[in-house]
Amino acid sequence: MDPSSLSNPQECKVTSLNLVLSVNFEKSQLQGYVEVASQIVKEGTESLILDTNQLEISHCNDVTSNPINFKLSEEHKVFGKALIISIPEGLRSVGKEFIVRVYYNTTVDSNALQWLTKDQTAGKLHPYLFSQCQAIHARSLVPCQDSPSNKVKYQAEITVPKPLTALMSALSTGKTESTDSSVFTFTQEIPIPTYLIAIVVGDLESRVIGPRSKVWSEPSMVAAAEYEFANTEKFIAVGEDLLTPYVWGRYDILLLPPSFPYGGMENPLLTFVTPTLLAGDRSLEGVVAHEIAHSWCGNLVTNKYWSEFFLNEGFTVFVERKILGRLYGEEMFDFEAMNGLKHLHDDVDLFTHKHQEELTALIPNLNGIDPDDAFSSVPYEKGFNLLCYLQSLVGVADFEAWLKSYISKFSYQSIVATQMKDYFIEYFTEKGKSEQISVVNWNDWFNKPGMPIEQVVFVSPAAKVAKDLAEITWIKDQGVNATKDDIKSFKTQQIILFLDTLIHSTSEKPLSVDVLEKMDSLYGFTDVVNSEYKFRWQTLCLHSGLKRIEPKVVEFLISQGRMKFVRPLYRELNKVNPELAKSTFNKYKSQYHIIASKMVAKDLGL
């Protein structure tokens, strides 16, 4: 049983969804029905139970329009309401198919959806809609078994006002037009967990960026996006070489408006990305490598429960860094690993400070907990470090061969960590390496809170140069011998590591305002375009009490809604100027995605 779902796939399993919906921007609603096909897997099952949250259910029919009885459970404050649909007596045997149409509409409180007015878009001409279903928000888009333990095919027929375009995480199969509306049809023939269902409706334009890829965005941003993501096909090709053939057909990218709360979301066929990646020099394209890696890790081999999220994210980070290493030199793998360890350390410290250390276990107990509340770098970086440790025991070539075999074996399935562990042991026992892998303390890796129990040593000369500049030139020597040329030859990742090292190493004893002013006069960090630099520089300045940065922080906070940036920055601003932090959030919270707004409110104690 999935503790994050109220549904019953272990008794009656949904196999496909067919969505027929109209997009109503005046009411901020999707209206229509979903046809749910399911199969009985437990003899005598009387009900199909679906997850819903903030949906209005009108009625249920069978395919011949006969009414079917249903009821909604009491509302659970995290997981919503169960929609309990009666299965006719003749269809309660194992293997029988039960098809029901659920007529419904979404509401303004459906937190999978963000409705933007035309003024909140880049073009200012048309409204915009986008979804974000991970982790447990698909149930506020469509009644479904909203658990990664169950995978479904889906089709859709979406009616939108002209001249807008609809896209989904599915193959576009057609468009028909009438006087004032267009109908777009889609099909997704590969079964996917419901958190990968996605929709966007807006004034969208596309450019071809590869043999199987386009980038989509509002017209004013499409040229910048075309340039920024030009290496997409290279990433896919390396992923295929490392793992298995890419099975999804297309790989398109959608550049979203600034309020999108994540860096990227791996919706199949249509990765969603934040405009904060538009650095102008392709320096932040690693996020695209990450989302491409999800085409295998997460989208094909899926964590069965959200507590085992590292099976999605730890594997994806590992493959992402393998891709970047193969393209840009093997040192890149170690460099990114060292950077990731810093982020992991910060999150472990944060959860420990909040007395939630149990959420730093690789497999935390999420009973009754919204997975969003447990979101951190732990499944990403601690999961990645587990794989690096396993690789160190068996060797790179053999581990990569196992990884390819693992993807082949578990594709199209949802699995638990013990299946991964058992297959690792079985595979390397057959290869004669049982002695090398006998040292793995799986129980502690999976269940012990805190930093990884074994530390792989990562080596990167480029990282050492960046760290030395931070620790010796600036922290030890206070910038006395610093020059403009210090970072002239630095790659983007080195500047990020330099700033991260400063933040991390001065947490107890901040740099003085005079030192930061000198640093800014040499390196010009206050006026950078790159969002990763800006976020770190502003964090550093707030921590040191550089008052003049506060208006710049507010400017950045209201210009985008990526949680990676807004949550820590609001927390830092709240420490030094709580009145400004709270008034800024209260004034602009309606511009943020509902997930981001909820999390920032918690961070600020509102």
From Swiss-Prot:
PROSITE patterns: ZINC_PROTEASE. The keyword Hydrolase applies. Binds 1 zinc ion per subunit. A peptide binds at Q132, C133, Q134, P261, Y262, G263, G264, M265, E266. It is an enzyme of class 3 (hydrolase). GO terms for cellular component: cytosol. It holds the Pfam family Peptidase_M1_N. Transmembrane segments: none annotated. GO terms for molecular function: aminopeptidase activity; epoxide hydrolase activity; metallopeptidase activity; zinc ion binding. GO terms for biological process: leukotriene biosynthetic process; peptide catabolic process; proteolysis. It is found in: Cytoplasm. InterPro entries: Aminopeptidase_N-like_N, Aminopeptidase_N-like_N_sf, ARM-type_fold, LTA4H_cat, M1_LTA-4_hydro/amino_C_sf, M1_LTA4H, Peptidase_M1, Peptidase_M1_C. Its EC number is 3.4.11.-, 3.3.2.10. It comes from the Eukaryota. The active site is at E291 (proton acceptor), Y380 (proton donor). Zn(2+) binds at H290, H294, E313. It catalyses: an epoxide + H2O = an ethanediol. Keywords: Cytoplasm, Hydrolase, Leukotriene biosynthesis, Metal-binding, Metalloprotease, Protease, Zinc. Its cofactor is Zn(2+). Belongs to the peptidase M1 family. Aminopeptidase that preferentially cleaves di- and tripeptides. Also has low epoxide hydrolase activity (in vitro). Can hydrolyze the epoxide leukotriene LTA(4) but it forms preferentially 5,6-dihydroxy-7,9,11,14-eicosatetraenoic acid rather than the cytokine leukotriene B(4) as the product compared to the homologous mammalian enzyme (in vitro). PANTHER family: LEUKOTRIENE A-4 HYDROLASE. This is Leucine aminopeptidase. It comes from Dictyostelium discoideum (Social amoeba). The gene is lkhA.
